Design a protein with these regions (language model features):
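Conserved N-terminal subdomain of the carbohydrate kinase-like
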Residues: 49-132
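Hydrophobic anchor at the start of a short beta-strand
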Residues: 49-50, 76, 158-160, 224
Length: 313
């Protein structure tokens, strides 16, 4: 029985074949994607299979994603198929080693139509960890569903982990910072990168955990994980955290990166795997999470086979 539930989007990424702009690209490579999907797959690869609540269309792209998740060891109990909506698509541009840019086709697609209550209370009673991201908050149906899930998980003393992932192109007129503020009181731990924090209303030096963590603690989470790319990652927790008040930093690992897409998701999976496994030293948690993230970058694709994280240490 899984002790972790991950919830959110899965989609198909299309990457240009060759170094050409999207407007002039004739051929694309198809890959499975979506931050929560990447987290669920990485957890399975770390021998901690998680339930994954998502929704894809009853179309060939949905078939591709459902088959990929199953092949990667993700239990299919909460992988829903929508007969009335298509699967989300994203076209990726930019340098994969420095950070991708996305053009989304997501209006009314299946993952925006998550419905409250589809994960029953008995499933939440069975898990100890719930991981959600911010992308579902951009769409009204999914927003209600994720809020409901987080509130019920919080009421059952599950540890709720929130991946703060700013995608301005998805939000339109919806208030990103406001939606983040609404969900944070029910969140225990938040993971973010500096570029996510400004749009979420965090002020000051967003590369400095001592500057950003107090602002996030005030909003609810007792633990903050800040990823810093090649510089590593930092963490800070208050006395309300099960691991006590602490600060930690780890400088990361130098690897020959092929593709950094999904590195942050691998980091999240590493954090959850370490904490769910009983680790309470945040320095050790960061060491493990950075190793998982580094290992994930040496092969192309956010769901590619994961080398042994110990191999990069």
């Amino acid at each position: 029985m899984p002790d972790v539930l991950v919830a959110g989007e899965t989609l198909v990424d299309f990457l240009p074949e060759g170094d050409t702009p999207l407007a002039t690209t004739d051929a694309f490579a198809r890959r499975p994607g979506g931050a929560p999907a990447n987290v669920a797959v990485r957890l399975a690869q770390l021998d901690r299979p998680a339930w994954f609540w998502t929704r894809v269309g009853s179309d060939p792209f949905g078939d591709f994603l459902a088959e990929t998740l199953a092949d990667r060891g993700v239990p299919d109990r909460f992988v829903e198929r929508d007969p009335s909506a298509k699967t989300t698509l994203a076209f990726v541009s930019g340098d994969p080693t420095s950070g991708p840019r996305f053009t989304f086709y997501r209006d009314g697609t299946a993952d925006t139509r998550l419905e409250p209550g589809r994960v029953p209370d008995d499933a939440l009673d069975a898990v100890e960890w719930v991981v959600v991201g911010s992308v579902p908050l951009a769409s009204a149906p999914a927003r209600r569903a994720v809020r409901d899930l987080v509130d019920r998980a919080n009421a059952r003393d599950c540890t709720v982990v929130f991946d703060l992932n700013a995608r301005p192109e998805l939000w339109g007129d919806t208030d990103f910072a406001g939606e983040v503020d609404r969900i944070l009181p029910a969140v225990d731990a938040v993971k973010a990168s500096p570029e996510d924090l400004g749009p979420a209303g965090i002020e000051g030096d967003t590369d400095d955990v001592d500057a950003v963590a107090p602002q996030l603690h005030e909003r609810g989470p007792h633990t903050v994980f800040l990823t810093l790319g090649e510089a590593g990652a930092a963490a800070r927790a208050t006395a309300d955290a099960p691991w006590g008040p602490t600060e930690a930093f780890h400088g990361g690992y130098a690897v020959d990166a092929v593709d950094t897409t999904g590195a942050g998701d691998a980091f999240t999976a590493g954090v959850v795997d370490a904490l769910a496994g009983g680790e309470r030293d945040l320095s050790a948690v960061l060491e493990r999470a950075n190793a998982v993230a580094a290992a994930a970058t040496v092969r192309a694709g956010g769901m590619a086979d994961l080398p042994d994280p110990d191999s990069v240490v």
